[in-house]
Amino acid sequence: MFEARLVQGSILKKVLEALKDLINEACWDISSGGVNLQSMDSSHVSLVQLTLRSEGFDTYRCDRNLAMGVNLTSMSKILKCAGNEDIITLRAEDNADTLALVFEAPNQEKVSDYEMKLMDLDVEQLGIPEQEYSCVVKMPSGEFARICRDLSHIGDAVVISCAKDGVKFSASGELGNGNIKLSQTSNVDKEEEAVTIEMNEPVQLTFALRYLNFFTKATPLSPTVTLSMSTDVPLVVEYKISDMGHLKYYLAPKIEDEEGS
């Protein structure tokens, strides 16, 4: 039996909004430690890794490990039926072919319950190696979303250049080019408004904006985002989920000679 209750049900709604446009279906690995999801996107370009630790839920019970194949579009449709203030409970029997979702309005006068059919998914787990990064940039998540959106009007790809004093985002296309530079902030009262850069060596990498704009759908989950970069390894875009986990996206850099791709 698996049962998890989340008083702040809006977190689950935001997680599904952040996943559904990138991944159609995925396996939710449920264990006593929490809920994990790892999946390549539909076109096998990027990788998504979600962790929701059991202690972040208000009550959590998992008698034995489960692997639930979920159609994320379907789950997103059901979660749209939950109000932002609703308490959400997920429930499944040990070898069930459905997942129950129960939404309780905070005033307790309305309870909705839905059953979603699960899928049989054949999933290969990819090992994500631990990695030291040359450059780690932490910045307001809304700012990153805006930069990606603005530069996608200029070109298809963004060059991210990271140096000690700041990080620069550049794009070029038929209409011209655009550059946005953020300097490290020294004294900001609110931590979530700061730009911090930890740099071992400078990095300059190119990424497809189409995917970064998918990743920024996770912006409502966290006031800050962390970008971790090294030459020749995938960029990691990480959104912390309050005190219960994280959502990480991995995207390989574009090789310079891939013109027109």
Swiss-Prot record:
GO terms for cellular component: centrosome; chromatin; cyclin-dependent protein kinase holoenzyme complex; male germ cell nucleus; nuclear body; nuclear lamina; nuclear replication fork; PCNA complex. InterPro entries: DNA_clamp_sf (IPR046938), Pr_cel_nuc_antig (IPR000730), Pr_cel_nuc_antig_C (IPR022649), Pr_cel_nuc_antig_CS (IPR022659), Pr_cel_nuc_antig_N (IPR022648). One of its GO terms (molecular function) is damaged DNA binding. There is a cross-link at K164 (Glycyl lysine isopeptide (Lys-Gly) (interchain with G-Cter in ubiquitin)). The keyword Amino-acid biosynthesis does not apply. Residues 61-80 bind DNA. Pfam families: PCNA_C (PF02747), PCNA_N (PF00705). Its main location: nucleus. Phosphorylated. Phosphorylation at Tyr-211 by EGFR stabilizes chromatin-associated PCNA. Keywords: Acetylation, Disulfide bond, DNA damage, DNA repair, DNA replication, DNA-binding, Isopeptide bond, Methylation, Nucleus, Phosphoprotein, Ubl conjugation. CDD domains: PCNA (cd00577). There is a cross-link at K164, K254 (Glycyl lysine isopeptide (Lys-Gly) (interchain with G-Cter in SUMO2)). One of its GO terms (biological process) is negative regulation of transcription by RNA polymerase II. The modification Phosphotyrosine is found at Y211. It comes from the Eukaryota. Transmembrane segments: none annotated. The modification N6-acetyllysine is found at K14, K77, K80, K248. Disulfide bonds join C135-C162. It is found in: Nucleus. Auxiliary protein of DNA polymerase delta and epsilon, is involved in the control of eukaryotic DNA replication by increasing the polymerase's processibility during elongation of the leading strand. Induces a robust stimulatory effect on the 3'-5' exonuclease and 3'-phosphodiesterase, but not apurinic-apyrimidinic (AP) endonuclease, APEX2 activities. Has to be loaded onto DNA in order to be able to stimulate APEX2. Homotrimer. Interacts with p300/EP300; the interaction occurs on chromatin in UV-irradiated damaged cells. Interacts with CREBBP (via transactivation domain and C-terminus); the interaction occurs on chromatin in UV-irradiated damaged cells. Directly interacts with POLD1, POLD3 and POLD4 subunits of the DNA polymerase delta complex, POLD3 being the major interacting partner; the interaction with POLD3 is inhibited by CDKN1A/p21(CIP1). Forms a complex with activator 1 heteropentamer in the presence of ATP. Interacts with EXO1, POLH, POLK, DNMT1, ERCC5, FEN1, CDC6 and POLDIP2. Belongs to the PCNA family. This is Proliferating cell nuclear antigen. It comes from Cricetulus griseus (Chinese hamster).
